[in-house]
Amino acid sequence: MTASISAIVSKWDSPPYTAQAGQFPFIDIGGYFTLLNTSYDPADLANLTWNQIGNDLSDPTSTVAKDVIGNANILTAATCIATGDTPSSVCGMATIQSIEAGLKTIKVTT
């Protein structure tokens, strides 16, 4: 692990950002955004089979689709901000642009 990566892990993988050190996963997106753990309640997937989850992903009104696809869209928008909206075929999508606009209003202190 490089020194810069080690510094990121040391900062974000410890209180007050997590209950205790070792609370992975966390994602750092280009130093712009850090997401700690999942952005939805894992209980929404509890007791579902892989087939049920797959079927639910096909229904945009399902809790599973809203959780998983919504989270993916947030990660995509954050990545687009970090890459200067590249690739435009993805980053130019209306949904992603709308989420980007919201993300850009978030004030973060480090």
How would you label these PLM feature ranges?
Residues V108-T110:
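Short, solvent-exposed mixed-charge patches
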Residues M1-L103:
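Thiol/selenol-based redox catalytic cores and closely related redox-interacting motifs
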